[in-house]
Amino acid sequence: MFLHEFEYELKGIGGLGEKGVERLNNLQIFNVKDLIEFFPVKYEDRQNIQTFPDFSKVKSCDMMTVFTVLGHKKFGDSSKKNLKLTVKSINEEPFEILLFNRAFLENVFKIDKKFYIYSKFTYNDYSGLWSCSNFDSEVYSDKPERFKKILPVYSLTEGLTSKKISLYVKEALEYFFKFGQTDIPRFLIEKYSLLSLSDALKEIHFPSSLEMLEKAKKTLIYREIFLLQFFSRYRSSKILFREKKDLSKDLLEKVVSSLPFELTEDQKISIDEIFFDLNSSKPMNRLLQGDVGSGKTLVALLSGLPLIEAGYQVAFMAPTDLLARQHYDNLSNILAPFNISMTLLTGSLRKKDKEQALESIRNGTSGLIVGTHAIFYESTEFKRLAYVIIDEQHKFGVVQREELKNKGEGVDMLLMSATPIPRSFALTLFGDLEVSFIKTLPKGRLPITTYLARHGNEDKVYEFLRKELLKGHQVYFVYPLISSSEKFELKDVNNMCLKLKEVFGEYVVDMLHSKLPSDLKEEIMKNFYSKKVDILVATSVIEVGIDCPNATCMVVEHAERFGLSTLHQIRGRVGRSNLQSFFFLLYKEPLTSAGKFRLKTIKENLDGFKIAEEDLRLRGPGNLFGLEQAGYLKLKIANFVDDREIIVLVREELDLFFYDNSAYDKLDIDLLDNLFCSYLNAGRSI
């Protein structure tokens, strides 16, 4: 049995009863597998006996020492809860240690007895004494139970100690060692000098030495990253091949030539990569990602033109009606001279318009379909669907994506991410995808200038904005709330829209938020694009997709309430032309350390990939990319940032394996085949 199959109940393990199981459940430990993979958060190195350091140089230290008790005395207020020990350590003069709230141990620390003790000791200059409150002690012996070892320290909850968890883990491991089997192929162990799975699990929980502990960590990191990538790659390797297409670039080249600007080198490379995949005998699965304003949407559109030219249909999915409408309008303008039939399909369409749209999709007269979730519906039938483009892919589930692909045969799929994803994370999360990166911005774009300002300096910001408005430019204001809340002392869209109408009386101010009807949101955005609205007050609903080249200023109030990637996305709504743009972050003090870090990072960095990496380090992948539902993202031991080199190595290893595994041992191939089958049989989603 593989480790992922050890989903047996915990009751009985190490004498666990219902109360103990409940406590482990509070730590998200629900079965034997979870318990085995509940790795320590740190370790106490009790291998070597130490003497107290020179207090003139060191005021605090974690250490294990040995001392003999020479005397003791209770002290403190009338309750006398504290204990003062006079002790003699190795080769040292007698000195005193304070044990806070430990007077009840007077009869344990008997005079002339020798003890091991491990604790965080702190030196107090005023009393001239070393003190500790939480410690572990044991009567001195040649074979101590908890000393002269490296002990694991686990995350805890009420009623549990690291010692108890160690006992439970020990019995769970014995069970696995008896009935389990490895899921690490030998070629990985030999090439990277890894431990066996059994040895790695034993050493991670009960290290025999610091050297073996590091080897165990390395092994389990490789294993976790390997399995993550292997499962998705294995699935894609079993995709049936199709007949190759012989696509032309004629229409693509005509449209590119008609553009009033030149594509960036990254855009050209991405289009070529996609074109190669579309012509191959294997359906494409590719992730297209780039920084804010890098031109991903244009690349996606252009890449579909060879298929439309050949008589196939292309579906372009957006997460909201507003964004779908914007894409439709922009693409219509680009394709107008080329007689390409387009259809918009959203849930907010009137019944008659929706019926017409569905009919044009069904009979094949529509080559490019832009829409929202409505494209997924059973009533939406395609005549010749060949290519699916999904914008903001994380907002659509795997099942939805597969349903859309199943509306055609051998359908190619391109996923786009609004948030730049660090390379190491993309290679792991999307192990079954090829990845195209667009890092360069279109020519002529100027770097956005970012300013930080404390609340109370609004008038200075308003004065700056007036100068931009006088030039005919437009402005955004973003707030964390739609309406006022009794829970939070935060500015909101409704009230600030009224105030800003007073402040900027000579200009047109309107607001946009998620609770407005779809048709009203579309009307407001049309007015903003046509410069009938000068100032748009909104929530973070504008963070993705809004594209108004004439808008040069963005003001975010209560900026400390927003995440790094969200702030970067919001900033990306300006700077979308050759006009100099400005980003104002108004924050309210006091700031948390994380809040200070976010604001400092966003001010000093314009690179979305760098910002995403810092956000990944801060918040983890689930929160950052909206992927909380994907349980496999909760890594047990690997780290997407710190272990990026291993991620790349494993990716390259799997490239070789899936390209030609004839050089690999049959035992390894059989192991991985069985592993994949057992994973599917266990009901896992991959």
Curated annotation (Swiss-Prot):
Helicase C-terminal domain ranges (all copies): 457-617
Highest taxon listed in the record's lineage: Bacteria
CDD domains linked to this entry: DEXHc_RecG (cd17992), SF2_C_RecG (cd18811)
E.C. no: 5.6.2.4
Domain Helicase ATP-binding: 277-438
Catalysed conversion reaction: Couples ATP hydrolysis with the unwinding of duplex DNA by translocating in the 3'-5' direction; ATP + H2O = ADP + phosphate + H(+)
UniProt xrefs under InterPro entries: ATP-dep_DNA_helicase_RecG, DEAD/DEAH_box_helicase_dom, Helicase_ATP-bd, Helicase_C-like, NA-bd_OB-fold, P-loop_NTPase, RecG/Mfd, RecG_dom3_C
Short motif DEAH box, span: 391-394
Keyword line: ATP-binding, DNA damage, DNA recombination, DNA repair, DNA-binding, Helicase, Hydrolase, Isomerase, Nucleotide-binding
Regions that span the bilayer: none
Positions bound to ATP: G290, D291, V292, G293, S294, G295, K296, T297
Region (Wedge domain): 47-148
Top EC category: isomerase
GO biological process terms held by the UniProt record: DNA recombination; DNA repair
Quaternary state and interactors: Monomer.
Sequence similarity: Belongs to the helicase family. RecG subfamily.
Biological role: Plays a critical role in recombination and DNA repair. Helps process Holliday junction intermediates to mature products by catalyzing branch migration. Has replication fork regression activity, unwinds stalled or blocked replication forks to make a HJ that can be resolved. Has a DNA unwinding activity characteristic of a DNA helicase with 3'-5' polarity.
Domain notes: The wedge domain within the N-terminus inserts into the replication fork junction, where the lagging and leading strand split.
Name recorded for this polypeptide: ATP-dependent DNA helicase RecG
Species the sequence originates in: Borreliella burgdorferi (strain ATCC 35210 / DSM 4680 / CIP 102532 / B31) (Borrelia burgdorferi)
Gene name tied to this protein: recG
